[in-house]
Amino acid sequence: KDLNKILSLNIPKHDKAGDNHYGLISALHKSIRGSDPDAGLFWLARALNAGEDPFYIFRRLLRISIEDVGLANPESQRLVLDSWNTYEKLGSPEGDIALAMSVILLSLSPKSNAVYLADKESQKFAKKYSSEQPPKHILNSPTKLMGRFGYGAGYEYDHCLLYTSPSPRDSRV
């Protein structure tokens, strides 16, 4: 009789490093990425009820703010950090509202992964050309000897030029 009662309980499934842990966090992340605040709040509540560390969730939300929201709402990073700070000061259950606020904010924010993609591409490019020296025109020339070797030759101080477009003036890197 007692065993049947225990077996009928709806105990949240969770493991700190296994499929349930990553499944809940993935569902939260993808709900936010999909701009669905209701689903995001549901998966947040599921994760918290299952015993997920709120600070792990905040780390994930911070990651979402820079990878998925990015430059479409750059303030989201600061707002997630402010919510994290609020949670640290209040603790649970009051601080849980700060978590929920971050989930809603990120869900409703426009999304851009341009920085994430640009960073990945620049890392590949830097690895491919890791032995290339910087072009001499952008090297510092603190001595006359370095100037004679071409360091800094042809460098144009951007603040002294009229700004015309976000594209480079020429093909020099």
Give residue ranges: language-model regions:
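Terminal-proximal interaction/regulatory segments of ATP-powered molecular machines
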Residues: 50-56, 65-142, 147, 151
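Conserved C-terminal helix/linker of AAA+ ATPases
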Residues: 1-10, 57-59
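C-terminal accessory/connector segments of nucleic-acid motor ATPases
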Residues: 37, 42, 54-58
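Conserved helicase/translocase motor-coupling segment
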Residues: 14, 29-30
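Amphipathic alpha-helical repeat elements characteristic of tetratricopeptide repeat
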Residues: 21-22, 38, 77
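Conserved small/polar residues in nucleotide/adenosyl-binding loops
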Residues: 163-170
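Inter-lobe coupling/hinge segments of SF2-like helicase ATPases
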Residues: 14-22
